[in-house]
């Protein structure tokens, strides 16, 4: 499975849409604003957000944006298929705001339920995003 990750600068993050719902904070004030699954990234924004993806798209992305990053740190995107850890991607964050993403290349065996856990440097779960891959 091929995995690729990228990051956005604080200025680029300013163009991101805001998110409603729960905001996760850790003890240092790291604030996760948005976590979405999507079909791509264009102009530093998620494209075609969804929770069900067709094998035909070939690749799935998890886009995360952090509204407050008090210091340089890392987060993890842990990709699980049917409750089995498939891959972990370590992503760097920079103050004061940051966006980042990771992706997986889809294979025929990847059909079914998935979840992605976003964890902070201390391995505390900030958010869980569930999605499925279908024909």
Task: Indicate residue ranges for each PLM-predicted region.
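Short, compositionally biased P/S/T/A/G/V-rich stretches that sit at domain boundaries
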Residues: 16-56
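Short edge beta-strand/loop segments characteristic of extracellular beta-sandwich folds
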Residues: 60-67
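Exposed aromatic-hydrophobic patches
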Residues: 63, 98-106
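Extracellular Ig-like/FN3 beta-sandwich strand-entry sites
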Residues: 72, 111-113
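Conserved aromatic beta-strand anchor motif in extracellular beta-sandwich/beta-rich domains
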Residues: 77-81, 118
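Short proline/glycine- and polar residue-rich coil/turn motifs
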Residues: 92-98
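Short, exposed beta-strand-loop hairpins at the edges of beta-sheets
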Residues: 107, 115-131
